[in-house]
UniProtKB/Swiss-Prot annotation:
Assembly and binders: NDH is composed of at least 16 different subunits, 5 of which are encoded in the nucleus.
Topological relation to the membrane, as annotated: Multi-pass membrane protein
InterPro entries: NADH_UbQ_OxRdtase_chain4L/K, NUOK/Mnh_C1-like
GO molecular function, a single term: quinone binding
Designated name of the protein: NAD(P)H-quinone oxidoreductase subunit 4L, chloroplastic
Family recorded in the similarity comment: Belongs to the complex I subunit 4L family.
Transmembrane segments: 2-22, 32-52, 61-81
Main location: plastid
Species of origin: Buxus microphylla (Littleleaf boxwood)
GO cellular component: chloroplast thylakoid membrane; NADH dehydrogenase complex
Gene for this chain: ndhE
Subcellular localization: Plastid, Chloroplast thylakoid membrane
């Protein structure tokens, strides 16, 4: 596959993730959009790593670290969302003002 096609795919995924993150009112949807952004970054890391120097695995190893960080972020984010849902009975971002009791 050509470099431009993969970069356009990564840009589309990143744009969809940013749009969803900006317009989302639901915390779970915002977490999903954040994961989409991280996956777009991984696609670009692996693509540039293969394009510039295919003998070294720097981009591939960095993308594995990003996947591990994304998994930890998703676990912590879902734990926070479930805790907020237990206390507030809502996962909407604008209804969960944590400063008020």
């Amino acid at each position: 596959m050509m470099l431009e096609h993969v970069l356009v795919l990564g840009a589309y995924l990143f744009s969809i993730g940013i749009y969803g993150l900006i317009t989302s009112r639901n915390m779970v949807r915002a977490l999903m959009c954040l994961e989409l952004i991280l996956n777009a970054v991984n696609i670009n890391l692996v693509t540039f790593s293969d394009f510039f120097d295919s003998r070294q695995l720097k981009g591939d190893i960095l993308s594995i670290f990003v996947i591990a960080i994304a998994a930890a972020e998703a676990a912590i984010g879902l734990a926070i969302v479930s805790s907020i849902y237990r206390n507030r009975k809502s996962t909407r971002i604008n209804q969960s003002n944590l400063l008020n009791k």
